[in-house]
C-alpha cells in the first residue's frame, strides 16, 4: 500500500509518472534497454533531454535569451557556482530568510564581500523581511534570495526591489508550483528532488548575458556555467535517469493544466491545512500568515513529547515523514504538486482525531 508521503525532499512524485517509468524500466520505447543503461550520447537519450528542455520552456514560458541547464551537485553546489560566475566586483547582497539562504551567504563570503541586507533570524525565520527599500551596495553583482524556505515554511509573495541589480533565486522547494515571470530574475535554480523529480539533479535557468568566461580565477571547469551551456548540459555524463523522470513530470504538469492549474491545486491543499491550524486548540502554525508557504507547512503542539507521539501515530496510520527538520523540531507537512488533495484532507481528519484524544 502506498502511503501519504509528506517528506520535504526527496518527496512525493505523481503516481502515473512512476507507473509509466516502471512500464519502461526494461525496454524504453523499443530500444531493448532501460534509460539507466543508455549512452548519454545516443539518439534516444538526446531526444529525451531535448524534449525535457522544450517542455520546461513551454511550462515556464522561458524566453529565448535564457539557457536551461541540467546540472549535478544539487542546489548546495550552486552556493559556490553563483559567486564564482557572477562576482565581477567581488560584492553581493544576500537576504537571509532561513538556513539555506544562510549557507549560500556563508559560501559566498569565501569568494568576496557578501553582505546581509535583510534577515528574519530575529524571530527564528518565521517571516519574510520587508525588501522594498534595501540598502544594496551600488556595485553589488547580484541580490540573492531563497524564495521558499523549506525548513521554516515561509515564501516571498513579492520579489525584493533589487534596484536594478541581478536577482538570483534558489527555488528548490517551490519550483513549478505556480506561474513565474522568468524575466524578473537573472538566475533561477533549484534541486529537483522536492517538486520535480528524483534527487541528484539541479535545473538552472540563466540569462545568457550572465554566462561568460569572465569568472573568478580558480573556478573549476565543471562549475563554469559556460562549460555547461556550450555543451547543452552534456559536458560530462549527466544524471540521465533524473532528467528522464523530470521530463515525465513536465508532461504531467502540462496535462494537469500547467502552472496556473498547479497554483489552484496547491492553494486548495494549503487552505485546508492552514484553516485547520488556525482554529485548532492543540496544533498551531509557526509562520506569519502573510508569509506562509504553499509547499511546506510547519506546526507544533507546544509539547515535545506530544509532537513525538503525533509523528509516531501518524506514521502508523500511513502519514509519513511529518517530523520537522532536525534543527527546529515539531512537525512539517510538505504538500508539493504531486500530493493529492485527498492526502491533505485525510491528514487533517487524523489531526482532528488526535486532538480529540490528546487535547
Question: Each PLM stretch: what is its role?
Answer:
Residues 283-314:
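Conserved PLP-binding catalytic core of the aspartate aminotransferase-like
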Residues 2-53:
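A glycine-/small-polar-enriched, mobile loop at the entrance of the PLP active site in fold-type I
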Residues 9, 108, 120-175:
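Active-site phosphate-binding strand-loop segment of PLP-dependent enzymes
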Residues 168, 182-193, 202:
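Conserved active-site segment immediately N-terminal to the catalytic lysine
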Residues 3, 316, 329-359:
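PLP-dependent enzyme catalytic core of the Aspartate aminotransferase-like
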Residues 14, 192-274, 288, 357-359:
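Active-site C-terminal subdomain of aminotransferase-like
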Residues 76-141:
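PLP-dependent aminotransferase-like
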Residues 33-78, 85, 99, 107:
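Conserved N-terminal alpha-helix of the aminotransferase class I/II PLP-enzyme fold
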Amino acid at each position: 500500500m502506498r502511503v501519504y508521503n509528506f517528506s520535504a525532499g526527496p518527496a512525493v512524485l505523481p503516481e502515473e509518472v512512476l507507473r509509466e517509468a516502471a512500464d519502461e524500466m526494461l525496454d524504453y520505447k523499443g530500444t531493448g534497454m532501460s534509460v539507466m543503461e543508455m549512452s548519454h550520447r545516443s539518439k534516444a537519450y538526446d531526444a529525451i533531454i531535448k524534449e525535457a528542455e522544450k517542455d520546461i520552456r513551454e511550462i515556464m514560458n522561458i524566453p529565448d535569451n535564457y539557457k536551461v541547464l541540467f546540472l549535478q551537485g544539487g542546489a548546495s553546489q550552486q552556493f559556490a557556482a553563483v559567486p564564482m560566475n557572477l562576482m565581477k566586483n567581488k560584492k553581493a547582497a544576500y537576504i537571509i530568510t532561513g538556513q539555506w539562504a544562510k549557507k549560500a551567504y556563508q559560501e559566498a563570503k569565501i569568494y568576496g564581500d557578501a553582505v546581509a541586507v535583510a534577515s528574519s533570524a530575529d524571530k527564528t525565520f518565521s517571516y519574510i523581511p520587508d525588501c522594498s527599500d534595501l540598502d544594496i551596495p551600488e556595485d553589488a553583482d547580484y541580490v540573492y534570495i531563497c524564495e521558499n524556505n523549506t525548513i521554516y515554511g515561509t515564501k516571498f509573495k513579492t520579489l525584493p526591489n533589487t534596484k536594478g541589480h541581478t536577482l538570483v533565486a534558489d527555488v528548490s522547494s517551490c519550483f513549478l508550483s505556480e506561474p513565474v515571470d522568468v524575466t524578473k530574475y537573472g538566475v533561477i535554480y533549484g534541486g529537483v528532488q522536492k517538486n520535480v523529480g528524483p534527487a541528484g539533479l539541479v535545473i538552472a535557468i540563466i540569462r545568457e548575458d550572465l554566462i561568460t568566461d569572465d569568472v573568478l580565477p580558480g573556478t573549476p571547469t565543471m562549475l563554469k556555467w559556460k562549460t555547461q551551456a556550450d555543451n547543452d548540459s552534456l559536458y560530462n555524463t549527466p544524471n540521465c535517469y533524473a532528467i528522464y523522470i523530470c521530463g515525465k513530470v513536465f508532461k504531467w504538469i502540462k496535462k494537469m493544466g500547467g502552472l496556473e492549474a498547479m497554483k489552484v491545486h496547491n492553494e486548495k491543499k494549503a487552505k485546508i491545512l492552514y484553516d485547520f491550524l488556525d482554529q485548532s486548540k492543540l496544533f498551531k502554525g509557526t509562520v506569519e500568515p502573510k508569509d506562509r508557504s504553499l509547499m511546506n507547512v510547519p506546526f507544533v503542539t507546544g509539547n515535545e513529547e506530544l509532537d513525538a507521539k503525533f509523528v509516531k501515530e501518524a506514521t502508523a496510520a500511513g502519514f509519513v515523514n511529518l517530523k520537522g527538520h532536525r534543527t527546529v523540531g515539531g512537525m512539517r507537512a510538505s504538500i508539493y504538486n504531486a500530493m493529492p488533495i485527498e492526502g491533505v484532507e485525510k491528514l487533517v481528519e487524523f489531526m482532528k482525531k488526535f486532538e480529540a484524544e490528546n487535547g
